Amino acid sequence: GIFSKLAGKKIKNLLISGLKNVGKEVGMDVVRTGIDIAGCKIKGEC
Protein backbone atom coordinates (compact mmCIF):
# COMPACT_ATOMS: atom_id res chain seq x y z
CA GLY A 1 0.00 0.00 0.00
CA ILE A 2 0.84 3.68 0.22
CA PHE A 3 2.39 3.29 3.67
CA SER A 4 4.85 0.57 2.67
CA LYS A 5 5.85 2.62 -0.37
CA LEU A 6 6.57 5.63 1.84
CA ALA A 7 8.38 3.52 4.42
CA GLY A 8 10.47 1.91 1.70
CA LYS A 9 11.42 5.32 0.34
CA LYS A 10 12.34 6.58 3.81
CA ILE A 11 14.46 3.52 4.58
CA LYS A 12 16.16 3.80 1.21
CA ASN A 13 16.94 7.48 1.83
CA LEU A 14 18.31 6.69 5.29
CA LEU A 15 20.50 3.93 3.86
CA ILE A 16 21.77 6.21 1.12
CA SER A 17 22.59 9.06 3.49
CA GLY A 18 24.22 6.58 5.89
CA LEU A 19 26.36 5.17 3.11
CA LYS A 20 27.31 8.69 2.01
CA ASN A 21 28.44 9.51 5.56
CA VAL A 22 30.45 6.29 5.81
CA GLY A 23 31.94 7.02 2.40
CA LYS A 24 32.91 10.48 3.56
CA GLU A 25 34.60 9.12 6.71
CA VAL A 26 36.48 6.46 4.77
CA GLY A 27 37.38 8.98 2.08
CA MET A 28 38.79 11.37 4.67
CA ASP A 29 40.89 8.58 6.20
CA VAL A 30 42.23 7.63 2.78
CA VAL A 31 43.03 11.27 2.00
CA ARG A 32 44.77 11.76 5.35
CA THR A 33 46.80 8.59 4.93
CA GLY A 34 47.74 9.66 1.41
CA ILE A 35 48.86 13.07 2.68
CA ASP A 36 50.92 11.44 5.46
CA ILE A 37 52.61 9.09 2.98
CA ALA A 38 53.25 11.92 0.52
CA GLY A 39 54.67 14.08 3.33
CA CYS A 40 57.10 11.43 4.58
CA LYS A 41 58.18 10.61 1.01
CA ILE A 42 58.96 14.29 0.40
CA LYS A 43 60.93 14.49 3.66
CA GLY A 44 62.48 11.08 2.98
CA GLU A 45 61.33 9.74 6.36
CA CYS A 46 59.60 6.53 5.27
UniProtKB/Swiss-Prot annotation:
InterPro entries (alphabetical): Antimicrobial_frog_2
Disulfide-linked positions: 40-46
Keyword Lipid metabolism: no
Localisation: Secreted
Domain of life: Eukaryota
Cellular component GO terms held in the UniProt record: extracellular region
Tissues where this protein is expressed: Expressed by the skin glands.
BP term (GO), one: killing of cells of another organism
Short name of any one Pfam family annotated for the protein: Antimicrobial_2
Keywords for this protein: Amphibian defense peptide, Antibiotic, Antimicrobial, Cytolysis, Disulfide bond, Hemolysis, Secreted
Function: Shows antibacterial activity against representative Gram-negative and Gram-positive bacterial species, and hemolytic activity.
Family stated for the protein in its record: Belongs to the frog skin active peptide (FSAP) family. Brevinin subfamily.
Protein name from the UniProt record: Esculentin-1A
Native source organism of the sequence: Pelophylax lessonae (Pool frog)
